[in-house]
Amino acid sequence: MKIAIGNDHTAVDLKNTISDYLKELGYEVINLGTDSRESCDYPIYGEKVGRAVADGEADLGIAICGTGVGISLAANKVKGIRACVCSEPYTAKLSRMHNNSNVLAFGARVVGSELAKMITEAWLDAKFEGGRHERRVNMIMEIENQ
């Protein structure tokens, strides 16, 4: 499975930590983030991750900025993307099981590396349940088509 990962300047170290962790778990990682700590604009990287997932270049995406909010907003502007901001594993798990999220976002200023690993693992291990949740996800996706 291929995972696109993108980040702004606040999240270089956490991106590297999560990338290494993903590789240890056997995932292929596509680095779409910056490796510079000079100030940059998170929407660029949120869009890159979103497009990689929407276009099928990656199966899933991870987006990291200071809080996770801005980069997730940018990713969510890409049609077909369901990005979620998670700061603990339970929400990450349910975002996959109930909302079929395809981009995980978190904040480098909010979660440390160990918690970020736990969030990532919970998200990746969870599977979409379908059923009533599929109907609701389809309703969300219909909003994009209006």
Task: Indicate where each model-derived feature is located.
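A short beta-strand-loop structural module common to alpha/beta enzyme folds
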Residues: 28-39
